[in-house]
Amino acid sequence: MHGITDGTYRLVSEYDPKGDQPKAIMALTDGVLRGDRWQTLLGVTGSGKTFTVSNVIAQVDKPVLVMSHNKTLAAQLYGELRQFFPDNAVEYFVSYYDFYQPEAYLPALDKYIAKDLRINDEIERLRLKTTSSLLSGRRDVIVVSSVSCIYGLGSPDDWKAQIVELRSGMEKDRDLFLQELVSLHYIRDDVDPGPGKFRVRGDIIDLVPAHEELALRVEFFGSEIESLQTFNIQSGELLGKDTYAFIYPARQFIAEAETLKQAMVAIENELAGRLNELRRDDRLVEARRLEERTRYDLEMMKELGYCSGIENYSRHLAGRSEGERPYCLLDYFPEDFLVIVDESHVTLPQIRGMYGGDRSRKAILVEHGFRLPSALDNRPLRFEEFTEIVPQVICVSATPGDLELERCGGVVVEQLVRPTGLLDPPVEVRPVKGQIDDLLAEIRRHTAKGHKALVMTLTKRMSEDLDDYFKKVGIRSRYLHSEIKSLERIQILRELRAGDVEVLVGVNLLREGLDLPEVSLVAILDADKEGFLRNTRSLMQIAGRAARNVDGFVVFYADVLTRSIMEVLDETARRRTVQQLYNETHGITPRSIRKSLDQVLNTTSVADAEERYRRKRFGLGAKSGVQSAALLHSFTPEESYAMVAELRLEMNEAAIQMEYEKAAYLRDEIARLMHGLEAQSDSKE
């Protein structure tokens, strides 16, 4: 809302860089200032990579985009960076859908699934705040984003052209200003104004900018703006006077009237051509369907300047050619911005895979007359387009992938020393013969100290059998498999930490950020069977799960020293040497990370909701006809929203996998649960 001048970063922290951090900060900063396009920070778990990156940001003084591969990690990074940079613009840009069922068509069943969604108003506000900050002209902007940043947005030039500048004392016609607000997609609401709305009381116009929480009061005297005041829309408390303010659009897709008119002509022309094709091929059903849908959208654009799904016409709105890449958040940055890719070994492949999945779904819609072919150009960036746009990139990972190593020429900046002084756990290779008896002895040795163990097998069947065997010989074990969802997984980890479980067994226990300080033993059976879960990167990741305990130990059961095993042994030995030397030089004694049982219970309490929900929903509750919403009365509000969030994650995953019927079922389940939550809230009021 307020005009903002250029700023510089001010890093706030009670800690100073130490260990490998000063060296890494200097190397990365020099690389950015030197103009290096790609750099990679190899930082072991717990070495303070976010703090290192924050120091680099503060020194290079560029607008920054921080990319993460999921919303949860993005939210964590957003929170950390806001603490490090409280005086700068740290923004959050992720998908604003609480749930999202994409438009789809199943030809085999002749079933159309309409797009359905629930937009999170707060995240939408934060997204608008992001674009507003980037176009405000300030340089001290850090945007934390998921891969949503590579999906299509409106033209930044069109968006910027619509910004309305207000100054106290300027000549401004009141009615013209109201028309400008409507053209920016602000809605008049004289009863309950909120973000993106305004109310009119004579010569006083109150509005809440779409990206702000505070309101702006514009007082007119004739055709002049007499005053601008910021106030709290809820309490009415005046917070201060302003000399000037900027009003930004309330939507991300926006076009000037002339641009919209030209786009509608282009849409009409494309529709006519496509209808001729369909009718020529005697596909009359598809032709009728396409004509009805498109003409309805055109009518909405004519009357309102907007329509549901307007992003599918973004090629015409932006005046782009067929196949030309769409505008996205990256286009809102100045030319010299810096990109930081967190967990790059996961995030970069995710970016590479976005285009194909999106195209395959939309191609079916186009083929069967639900969308014009131009909808295919409302898409995420191709990986090649992404790499062309970004001027400078720092990849951050404990195990950098081939994509980033290739672009960095194999040169990485290392950060191997942890602030706690903990060393990478030693790795030992033992023969396969007698591996179960040997493993059992190791487990008992570690659990006798109160520690826990992770065991990775080659197949699901082997994991189940081993879990059964451990139970028979008195080991408290649990089998963790791929079908277990997030909250249930948290419940199992809670049992592990609380002492109810001593051993976790599974095929793939590889989870970035799996924080288990109680684990001192990691065992990998059949480690010499090369494959995705036995390659160098995977073996290093899973071995790192024992790196939070001073007694950490890793054992590979293998008869053949594969290339992957040898690389892990060599890399572990190298890291331990560096870490040991640093500890000896600085008199540091390694200590395990400690967490109290109260901390464990507090961080995993939402798992109780999952257990009660599943027991009631699919047990007694289901038999007695109790609806989902009614079950929420036994949950705390925090547990209820955690349950809804978990189901949304499952629904989004189903949609990505094109399991549309499952996603639709979960969508309906979420709607019932949300209805119950709203009913609870109303009853309390």
Curated annotation (Swiss-Prot):
Species per Swiss-Prot/TrEMBL record: Chlorobium phaeobacteroides (strain DSM 266 / SMG 266 / 2430)
Its principal location?
cytoplasm
Q: Where is the Helicase ATP-binding domain?
A: 30-188
* Name recorded for this polypeptide: UvrABC system protein B
For the keyword Metal-binding, the answer is no
Binding site residues for ATP: 43-50
What does the UniProt entry say about where the protein is found? Cytoplasm
Family note = Belongs to the UvrB family.
Q: Which keywords label this protein? A: ATP-binding, Cytoplasm, DNA damage, DNA excision, DNA repair, Excision nuclease, Helicase, Hydrolase, Nucleotide-binding, SOS response
Q: Which InterPro entries match?
A: Helicase/UvrB_N, Helicase_ATP-bd, Helicase_C-like, P-loop_NTPase, UVR_dom, UVR_dom_sf, UvrB, UvrB_inter
Locate the coiled-coil region(s) and give their ranges.
Answer: none
Which CDD domains does the entry mention? DEXHc_UvrB, SF2_C_UvrB
